[in-house]
């Protein structure tokens, strides 16, 4: 890729599936099996397509509907992030460590069509199930579905992500972000790398680097946006 992609559609169909299908997208450890799983970009893309099928077949008129993610960091979190966006839904990453009062306030504002969760109790599981039980679905539900044969670009300036602030000065505010908002930040980072071309061999993957952030954080959302040129780094 000669430049950072500007749409999620291109990131998946061009980056993951055509240019770098055999490169490593993720490596993650599963405590139950004591194993490290390696996922290639082509495999990640197939799981994203499965999520598109899942959401579009279970949410009536899925376009513009809110899908909340309530989970710890995981491979499934990233799959559902990209899948919800490509299904035309509005992604709502949520801080699972917030109090029920804070969380319920955000959910009332959002009016979600689905809440994807890892099923763990972060302190509000009982209240969550009582209030939104019919909307709760496991994070790995996409695995039961076939990959979508076709993907379609989303509106570049349409609402794509609704991200809540930390609420340090009061109740959390929902920040409305479009595809243009998110990918413009990635293009800035790409431009900085291009200026360092005389110091970095841009034909090779960058050295491994680490970011310790929850996936509901804006910085982590940007970091996990597909950027196959440094895809040999462990995610």
Specify the residue positions occupied by each region the protein language model found.
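Conserved pre-ATP/AMP-binding loop-to-beta segment of ANL
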Residues: 21-24, 147-164, 170-171, 197-208
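Conserved structural elements of the adenylate-forming
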Residues: 45-53, 175-201, 206, 212
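N-lobe entry segment of adenylate-forming
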Residues: 1-58, 63, 87, 108
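Conserved AMP-binding A3 loop
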Residues: 38-42, 160-188, 232-235
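Conserved AMP-binding/adenylate-forming
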Residues: 35-37, 52-98, 211-214
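Structural core segment of the AMP-binding/adenylate-forming
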Residues: 82, 86-153
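Conserved small/polar residues in nucleotide/adenosyl-binding loops
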Residues: 165, 223-230
């Amino acid at each position: 890729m000669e430049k950072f992609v500007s749409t999620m559609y291109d990131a998946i169909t061009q980056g993951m599936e055509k240019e770098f299908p055999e490169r490593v997208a993720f490596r993650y450890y599963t405590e139950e099996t004591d194993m490290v799983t390696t996922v290639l970009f082509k495999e990640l893309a197939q799981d994203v397509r499965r999520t598109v099928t899942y959401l579009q077949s279970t949410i009536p008129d899925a376009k513009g509907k809110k899908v909340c993610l309530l989970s710890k960091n995981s491979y499934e979190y990233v799959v559902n992030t990209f899948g919800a966006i490509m299904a035309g839904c509005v992604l709502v990453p949520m801080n699972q460590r917030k109090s029920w009062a804070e969380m319920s306030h955000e959910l009332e504002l959002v009016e979600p069509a689905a809440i994807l969760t890892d099923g763990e109790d972060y302190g509000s599981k009982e209240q969550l199930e009582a209030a939104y039980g019919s909307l709760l679905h496991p994070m790995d539900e996409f695995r039961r579905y076939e990959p979508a044969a076709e993907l379609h670009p989303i509106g570049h300036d349409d609402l794509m992500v609704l991200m809540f602030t930390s609420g340090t000065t009061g109740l959390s505010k929902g920040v409305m972000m479009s595809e243009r908002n998110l990918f413009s930040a990635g293009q800035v980072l790409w431009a900085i790398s291009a200026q360092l071309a005389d110091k970095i061999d841009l034909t090779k993957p960058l050295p491994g680097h680490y970011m310790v952030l929850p996936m509901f954080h804006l910085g982590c959302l940007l970091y996990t946006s597909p950027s196959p040129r440094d895809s040999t780094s462990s995610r």
